[in-house]
From Swiss-Prot:
Disruption phenotype: Deficient mice exhibit stronger antitumor immunity.
Glycosylated residue positions: 3
Membrane-spanning intervals of the chain: 22-42, 49-69, 90-110, 133-153, 182-202, 225-245, 269-289
Cytoplasmic compartment residues: 43-48, 111-132, 203-224, 290-319
Pfam families listed in its UniProt record: 7tm_1
Keywords for this protein: Cell membrane, G-protein coupled receptor, Glycoprotein, Membrane, Receptor, Transducer, Transmembrane, Transmembrane helix
Name of the protein described by the UniProt record: G-protein coupled receptor 171
Similarity comment text for this entry: Belongs to the G-protein coupled receptor 1 family.
Gene: Gpr171
Location(s) in or outside the cell: Cell membrane
UniProt membrane topology term: Multi-pass membrane protein
Organismal lineage: Eukaryota, Metazoa, Chordata, Craniata, Vertebrata
PANTHER family according to UniProt: G-PROTEIN COUPLED RECEPTOR 171, P2Y PURINOCEPTOR-RELATED G-PROTEIN COUPLED RECEPTOR
Disulfide bonds: none
Length: 319
């Protein structure tokens, strides 16, 4: 870092964000724990979409581990070693969750599209064995990209306030961080195209079936697609609109102090939207997994209402 950047108070005034991060954490941990319980209780036959949702849930638990540390660090009450740990480990867990979520939402969209367009066929990509294999490949790929940021040696710098994670990185660590950012943006762009195309094809197929006698199912399927698309756009698009300019400000390509501060605040605000997928995901589980819907029905509906609801849900296809 240059002297000019040393005196630029980029990493201050984070306390207002921490309250929202805490709210996301609280809602997310409750929803994720309930979802885990529901899947364990009810899921016996795993279809592809259930496998992808379980992987999404696993990624969400990584985020719940990381958020408390981020909150403590951003409040300015963390000891120095915890701040270093956050930069090396928990910050990376947040991004591991983000890109796993993006990829698995794309696979959910593909599976949904194939179910609607070719309902009488089962392709290799729709087999549970393939879903498990591709899930393992996705985890391995994301970890290979992210884990080096955790293990690359860092600089031993003097304890001080207003320090950013980039200041701990040596030259190789900075270069890897920059490469990681561009790879992640490429992942986002490619899987965004997949999600948009899959959902467009699915909506077109539903539009063709709008006069079908089974209209309630068509309407329900349309709702599922719109939920996935809306949660994806709200959570991930704003962050990636800011990510490249913010990365350039970290590497001194953008050196104006006021611009760097504005980009950092924009990054934190859009990161808050990105981690809010922790709150949206239980809603997706409810609409996309019959096992989850059944457990919610059993738990929260009155005994008189729960039985007919359960019978109706069991008669539906697991989506």
């Amino acid at each position: 870092m240059t002297n000019s950047s040393t005196f630029c108070p980029v990493y201050r005034d984070l306390e207002p964000f921490t309250y929202f991060f805490y709210l996301v954490f609280l809602i997310g941990i409750i929803g994720s724990c309930f979802a885990t319980w529901a899947f364990i209780q009810k899921t016996t036959n795993h279809r592809c979409v259930s496998i992808y949702l379980i992987n999404l849930l696993t990624a969400d638990f990584l985020l719940t581990l990381a958020l408390p540390v981020k909150i403590i660090v951003d409040l300015g009450v963390a000891p120095w070693k915890l701040r270093i740990f956050h930069c090396q480990v928990t910050a990376c867990l947040i991004y591991i969750n983000m890109y796993l979520s993006i990829i698995f939402l794309a696979f959910v969209s593909i599976d949904r599209c194939l179910q609607l367009i070719h309902s009488c066929k089962i392709y290799r990509i729709q087999e549970p064995g393939f879903a498990k294999m591709i899930s393992a490949v996705v985890w391995l790929m994301v970890l290979l990209i992210m884990v080096p940021n955790m293990v690359i040696p860092i600089k031993d710098i003097k304890e001080k306030s207003n320090v950013g994670c980039m200041e701990f990185k040596k030259e190789f660590g900075r270069n890897w961080h920059l490469l990681t950012n561009f790879i992640c943006v490429a992942i986002f762009l490619n899987f965004s195209v997949i999600i948009l195309i899959s959902n467009f094809l699915a909506i077109r197929q539903l539009y063709r079936n709008r006069d079908n006698t089974n209209y309630p199912s068509v309407k329900s399927a349309l709702l599922h697609i719109l939920l996935v698309t809306a949660s994806y756009i709200i959570c991930f698009v704003p962050y990636h609109a800011v990510r490249i300019p913010y990365t350039l400000s970290q590497t001194e390509v953008i050196s104006d102090c006021s611009t760097r501060i504005a980009l950092f605040k924009a990054k934190e605000a859009t990161l808050l939207l990105a981690v809010s997928n922790l709150c949206f995901d239980p809603i997706l589980y409810y609409h996309l997994s019959k096992a989850f819907r059944l457990k919610v029905t059993e738990t929260f509906a009155s005994p008189k209402k729960s039985k007919p609801l359960e019978e109706r849900l069991r008669s539906e296809n697991d989506v």
